[in-house]
Protein backbone atom coordinates (compact mmCIF):
# COMPACT_ATOMS: atom_id res chain seq x y z
CA UNK A 1 0.00 0.00 0.00
CA UNK A 2 1.25 3.48 -0.87
CA UNK A 3 0.37 6.63 0.98
CA UNK A 4 1.36 10.26 0.85
CA UNK A 5 3.29 10.88 4.07
CA UNK A 6 4.70 14.39 3.65
CA UNK A 7 4.45 17.48 1.46
CA UNK A 8 7.25 20.02 1.24
CA UNK A 9 7.04 23.50 -0.27
CA UNK A 10 10.20 25.33 -1.32
CA UNK A 11 9.69 28.86 -2.69
CA UNK A 12 6.24 27.72 -3.74
CA UNK A 13 2.89 29.49 -3.42
CA UNK A 14 4.24 32.34 -1.26
CA UNK A 15 5.69 29.75 1.14
CA UNK A 16 9.49 30.04 1.49
CA UNK A 17 9.77 26.63 3.19
CA UNK A 18 7.32 24.25 4.81
CA UNK A 19 7.24 20.55 5.65
CA UNK A 20 3.86 19.09 6.56
CA UNK A 21 3.54 15.50 7.74
CA UNK A 22 0.42 13.80 6.40
CA UNK A 23 0.79 10.34 7.91
CA UNK A 24 -1.53 11.05 10.84
CA UNK A 25 -4.31 13.43 11.72
CA UNK A 26 -3.79 16.91 10.31
CA UNK A 27 -5.81 19.95 11.35
CA UNK A 28 -5.42 23.22 9.45
CA UNK A 29 -6.58 26.37 11.22
CA UNK A 30 -5.86 30.03 10.62
CA UNK A 31 -7.24 33.28 9.37
CA UNK A 32 -8.06 33.94 5.74
CA UNK A 33 -5.10 34.03 3.40
CA UNK A 34 -2.54 32.09 5.46
CA UNK A 35 -2.30 29.07 3.14
CA UNK A 36 -4.81 26.42 4.27
CA UNK A 37 -6.43 26.07 0.84
CA UNK A 38 -3.04 26.39 -0.83
CA UNK A 39 -1.77 23.29 0.97
CA UNK A 40 -5.01 21.37 0.40
CA UNK A 41 -4.95 22.12 -3.34
CA UNK A 42 -1.35 20.91 -3.58
CA UNK A 43 -2.37 17.66 -1.85
CA UNK A 44 -5.33 17.30 -4.23
CA UNK A 45 -2.97 17.92 -7.16
CA UNK A 46 -0.95 14.88 -6.10
CA UNK A 47 -4.03 12.67 -6.35
CA UNK A 48 -5.52 13.95 -9.60
CA UNK A 49 -2.42 15.46 -11.31
CA UNK A 50 -4.47 18.04 -13.15
CA UNK A 51 -4.43 21.74 -12.36
CA UNK A 52 -7.89 22.14 -13.91
CA UNK A 53 -9.95 20.45 -11.17
CA UNK A 54 -8.52 22.19 -8.09
CA UNK A 55 -11.23 24.79 -7.53
CA UNK A 56 -8.96 27.75 -8.26
CA UNK A 57 -11.15 30.77 -9.11
CA UNK A 58 -10.65 32.14 -12.63
CA UNK A 59 -9.68 35.59 -11.31
CA UNK A 60 -6.69 34.12 -9.44
CA UNK A 61 -3.33 33.02 -10.87
CA UNK A 62 -3.36 29.59 -12.48
CA UNK A 63 -1.75 26.62 -10.72
CA UNK A 64 1.58 26.81 -12.57
CA UNK A 65 2.05 30.56 -12.02
CA UNK A 66 1.02 30.49 -8.35
CA UNK A 67 2.83 27.36 -7.14
CA UNK A 68 5.94 27.70 -9.32
CA UNK A 69 6.75 31.42 -9.65
CA UNK A 70 10.55 30.95 -9.60
CA UNK A 71 13.08 28.65 -11.21
CA UNK A 72 13.81 27.29 -7.71
CA UNK A 73 10.17 26.66 -6.74
CA UNK A 74 9.43 23.05 -5.83
CA UNK A 75 6.76 20.89 -4.26
CA UNK A 76 8.08 17.57 -3.01
CA UNK A 77 5.76 14.70 -2.19
CA UNK A 78 7.13 11.95 0.03
CA UNK A 79 5.36 8.64 -0.48
CA UNK A 80 5.58 5.57 1.76
CA UNK A 81 5.28 2.12 0.25
CA UNK A 82 5.77 -1.41 1.51
CA UNK A 83 9.49 -1.48 0.74
CA UNK A 84 10.53 2.08 1.59
CA UNK A 85 10.00 5.74 0.87
CA UNK A 86 10.37 7.68 -2.35
CA UNK A 87 9.97 11.32 -3.35
CA UNK A 88 8.35 13.06 -6.26
CA UNK A 89 9.84 16.45 -7.07
CA UNK A 90 7.46 18.76 -8.90
CA UNK A 91 8.92 21.89 -10.46
CA UNK A 92 8.74 23.94 -13.62
CA UNK A 93 11.12 23.41 -16.51
CA UNK A 94 10.95 25.36 -19.75
CA UNK A 95 7.59 26.81 -18.71
CA UNK A 96 5.92 23.46 -17.95
CA UNK A 97 5.34 21.43 -14.82
CA UNK A 98 7.55 18.37 -14.64
CA UNK A 99 8.00 15.50 -12.20
CA UNK A 100 11.10 13.63 -11.14
CA UNK A 101 11.15 10.53 -8.96
CA UNK A 102 13.81 9.81 -6.36
CA UNK A 103 13.98 6.41 -4.68
CA UNK A 104 14.91 7.86 -1.27
CA UNK A 105 13.31 9.81 1.58
CA UNK A 106 13.34 13.60 1.27
CA UNK A 107 16.44 15.44 2.46
CA UNK A 108 16.35 19.23 2.88
CA UNK A 109 20.06 19.42 1.98
CA UNK A 110 19.26 18.39 -1.60
CA UNK A 111 17.70 21.81 -2.20
CA UNK A 112 18.94 24.19 0.49
CA UNK A 113 22.52 25.13 1.28
CA UNK A 114 24.35 27.40 3.67
CA UNK A 115 22.45 30.46 4.79
CA UNK A 116 19.16 28.81 3.76
CA UNK A 117 19.91 29.55 0.10
CA UNK A 118 17.80 27.47 -2.27
CA UNK A 119 19.81 26.05 -5.16
CA UNK A 120 18.82 27.44 -8.57
CA UNK A 121 20.52 24.87 -10.78
CA UNK A 122 18.93 21.45 -11.33
CA UNK A 123 22.40 19.96 -12.02
CA UNK A 124 23.46 20.97 -8.49
CA UNK A 125 20.32 19.48 -6.95
CA UNK A 126 20.72 16.26 -8.97
CA UNK A 127 24.35 15.99 -7.84
CA UNK A 128 23.39 16.50 -4.18
CA UNK A 129 20.64 13.87 -4.43
CA UNK A 130 22.92 11.26 -5.97
CA UNK A 131 25.76 12.04 -3.58
CA UNK A 132 23.68 11.78 -0.39
CA UNK A 133 21.20 9.05 -1.35
CA UNK A 134 23.25 6.93 -3.74
CA UNK A 135 20.47 7.06 -6.32
CA UNK A 136 19.82 9.18 -9.39
CA UNK A 137 16.59 11.12 -9.91
CA UNK A 138 14.49 9.88 -12.81
CA UNK A 139 14.29 11.70 -16.10
CA UNK A 140 11.70 14.45 -16.35
CA UNK A 141 8.12 13.31 -16.68
CA UNK A 142 6.32 16.13 -18.48
CA UNK A 143 2.70 15.02 -18.84
CA UNK A 144 -0.02 14.60 -16.26
CA UNK A 145 -1.10 11.37 -17.95
CA UNK A 146 2.31 9.73 -17.67
CA UNK A 147 2.62 10.88 -14.05
CA UNK A 148 -0.74 9.27 -13.22
CA UNK A 149 0.28 6.07 -15.04
CA UNK A 150 3.49 5.86 -12.99
CA UNK A 151 1.76 6.55 -9.68
CA UNK A 152 -1.32 4.40 -10.17
CA UNK A 153 0.04 1.78 -12.58
Language-model regions: role of each:
Residues 1-152:
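Extreme N-terminal "head/tail" segments of very large remodeling/mechanoenzyme assemblies
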Amino acid sequence: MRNLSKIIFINSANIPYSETRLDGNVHFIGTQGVGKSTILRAILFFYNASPIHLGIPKEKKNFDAFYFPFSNSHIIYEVERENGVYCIIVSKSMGRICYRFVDAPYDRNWFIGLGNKVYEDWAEIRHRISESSGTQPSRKVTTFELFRDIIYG
